[in-house]
Regions:
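PLD/PLD-like phosphodiesterase catalytic module centered on the HKD motif
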Residues: 1-181
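Pre-Walker A adenine-sensing motif
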Residues: 184
């Protein structure tokens, strides 16, 4: 396999972004001769601002060997990181860290920056990125998502609706503002 495991950390995942990469991801995660996915795929994302799309996660979850974890509380966990770690048992892993979410706009037309570093060339940095991903993966803030589980679907759908501002009545905020002496 070109890669043994891919770990993806992005704030938002949209259907347009998944469609751009689906063929590559299907090839990478295809079942091999040993009846196992050739590449394990782990994804961490959020419901922050309601930008992640349910159907995008559903499509990814159908890939063999794909596991997804989602923070359902966009107000508490403001994950803004974007990183892709390609891990290889050979020790020739690589990572891409930048500004692009997994969306069509970011992948195709956005003005995004991405930096690549390698396990061999920048081993400390690569290990730090890998360890940070593992820490987030094990954090209970990021809940497993299985589209076949009705509770998971309901919780994710509700979190996305709330983050997008649907069905939530905005509470007015009142301030007692007083100008500073130099502002009068």
């Amino acid at each position: 396999a070109a890669c043994d495991q891919v770990d993806i950390l992005v704030s938002f995942i949209t259907h347009s972004g998944v469609r751009k990469l689906l063929d590559v991801l299907q090839t990478a995660t295809a079942i091999g001769a040993d009846d196992q996915p050739r590449t394990r795929l782990r994804i961490i994302t959020t419901t922050y601002t309601g930008a992640t799309e349910l159907r995008a996660l559903d499509e990814l979850a159908r890939l063999p060997g794909c596991e997804i974890r989602v923070s359902l509380d966009g107000r508490r966990t403001r994950l803004h990181a974007k990183a892709w770690l390609f891990q290889r048992q050979s020790g020739f892993g690589s990572a891409y860290v930048g500004s692009a979410n997994l969306s069509g706009a970011a992948l195709m037309g956005g003005l995004e920056w991405t930096v690549k570093f390698t396990e061999r060339g920048q081993s400390d940095l690569f290990e730090h990125a890998r360890a940070h991903f593992e820490t987030l993966w094990e954090d209970s803030e990021f809940q497993p998502y299985d589209p076949a589980n009705p509770q998971h679907r309901r919780a994710l759908n509700e979190a996305l609706r709330q983050e997008a501002g649907q069905g939530v009545m905005a509470q007015p905020t009142y301030f007692d503002l007083q100008p500073k002496r130099y502002q009068q």
